[in-house]
């Protein structure tokens, strides 16, 4: 199966003189439809790596390959915005939904931004909201939803443009374990059907074990593990 997303020798450092390394020569390839779990302690660089992968932060060196398009520190903001809108989906622990918009309006938004008509965006949003079991809450304000329902809206919004890959940063971190597994199963089911890859940063080992493989980040360095590899539960 073809690679749809890759990080090549990503290095990121902070500090006045860039003397504090956060990501050290990270290389990762993700195939179409593959789910990769990114685990590591708080402060290990998971969120920084996802921000770089999502073209929201620029690496000190290295490149990102998305749909056979190479992105480096020389890639323009305009090109990055285009790639984000057309090829990437994002889910965060704190969902960044628009509180003043309804469920339906939140999910329609990515399609409107990428040029779809309101009628098409509404049709597609209603279809995907049915898939995440929110068809009876289309006009409800976000503020009236439960935590699990809000994350289902976030999942629907991340998937509506059928991205190549969804970058999920602790997407169920604020939910209890049963709700987290239920919400992630909805994401996993739709992604599998549409062959969408997922890079999942999580502290939840129950979720991590649903991935195709595990990548651990430790002091900015990536190490890969298979799901059934001896000692995984000790990572």
UniProtKB/Swiss-Prot annotation:
Residues that bind ATP: 40-47
Membrane topology label: Peripheral membrane protein
Keywords, alphabetical: ATP-binding, Cell inner membrane, Cell membrane, Membrane, Nucleotide-binding, Translocase, Transport
Compartmental location: Cell inner membrane
E.C. code: 7.6.2.-
Superkingdom of source: Bacteria
Cysteine-cysteine disulfides: none
Any single GO CC term annotated in Swiss-Prot or TrEMBL for this entry: plasma membrane
PROSITE patterns in alphabetical order: ABC_TRANSPORTER_1 (PS00211), ABC_TRANSPORTER_2 (PS50893), LOLD (PS51244)
InterPro entries found in the cross-reference section: AAA+_ATPase, ABC_transporter-like_ATP-bd, ABC_transporter-like_CS, MacB-like_ATP-bd, P-loop_NTPase
Top-level EC class: translocase
Gene3D superfamilies: P-loop containing nucleotide triphosphate hydrolases
Gene Ontology MF terms: ATP binding; ATP hydrolysis activity
Pfam families per UniProt: ABC_tran (PF00005)
Domain ABC transporter per the UniProt entry, residue ranges: 5-235
Stated family: Belongs to the ABC transporter superfamily. Lipoprotein translocase (TC 3.A.1.125) family.
Function, in words: Part of the ABC transporter complex LolCDE involved in the translocation of mature outer membrane-directed lipoproteins, from the inner membrane to the periplasmic chaperone, LolA. Responsible for the formation of the LolA-lipoprotein complex in an ATP-dependent manner.
Entry-linked PANTHER family: ALPHA-D-RIBOSE 1-METHYLPHOSPHONATE 5-TRIPHOSPHATE SYNTHASE SUBUNIT PHNL (PTHR42798:SF7), LIPOPROTEIN-RELEASING SYSTEM ATP-BINDING PROTEIN LOLD (PTHR42798)
Complex and partners: The complex is composed of two ATP-binding proteins (LolD) and two transmembrane proteins (LolC and LolE).
Record's protein name: Lipoprotein-releasing system ATP-binding protein LolD
Organism the protein comes from: Ehrlichia chaffeensis (strain ATCC CRL-10679 / Arkansas)
Gene behind this protein: lolD
